[in-house]
């Protein structure tokens, strides 16, 4: 193979890898975190937003106490969001509130009012079908 072609193949492989081709969130194991309250009672939790998965994918909070969720975007190229819209449980993080791109950090605040398990997901294109989902557990 000529040297120029080998360089092109290597560059194409690197680009596809960087774009997350072939990545599936369904193969990522479930990880869990319990939100930590500060002195004022606000529960804090950090969720990393990767290529087609959230880490942790299971977040545990207490009902009736405010939650500050920090979303840390860990992907350079593909935009994502975190959507969790359950008005009956006091949780409303819509597509635009949880939208981010290009290594940004975003904070969303809500006060869950009712215990239960509430799914969250990425509402961009087919990301949810690729396994970009999680669960907010309210105790």
Describe each region flagged by the PLM:
Residues 81-85:
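Beta-strand signatures of extracellular beta-sandwich domains
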Residues 32, 37-66:
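N-terminal edge beta-strand
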Residues 1-10:
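Bacterial N-terminal signal peptides that target proteins for export
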Residues 86-92, 138-139:
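Short edge-strand/loop segments of extracellular domains
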Residues 49-57, 68, 92-95, 103-105:
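N-terminal post-signal-peptidase region of extra-cytosolic proteins
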Residues 57-78, 105-114, 118, 138:
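Beta-strand cores of secreted/periplasmic/IMS beta-sandwich domains, seen most often
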Residues 17-20:
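C-terminal motif of bacterial Sec signal peptides marking the signal peptidase cleavage site
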Residues 23-34, 53, 100-139:
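Extracellular/periplasmic metallocenter environments
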């Amino acid at each position: 193979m000529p040297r120029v072609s080998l360089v092109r193949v290597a560059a194409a492989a690197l680009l596809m890898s960087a774009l997350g081709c072939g990545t599936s969130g369904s193969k990522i194991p479930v990880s869990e975190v319990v939100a930590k309250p500060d002195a004022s009672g606000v529960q804090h939790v950090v969720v990393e937003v990767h290529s087609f998965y959230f880490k942790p994918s299971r977040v545990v909070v207490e009902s009736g106490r405010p939650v500050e969720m920090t979303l840390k975007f860990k992907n350079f190229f593909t935009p994502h969001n975190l959507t969790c819209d359950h008005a009956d449980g006091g949780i409303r993080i819509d597509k635009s509130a949880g939208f981010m791109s290009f290594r940004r950090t975003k904070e969303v605040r809500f006060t869950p009012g009712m215990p239960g398990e509430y799914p969250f997901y990425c509402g961009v294109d087919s990301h949810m079908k690729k396994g970009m989902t999680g669960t907010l557990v309210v105790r």
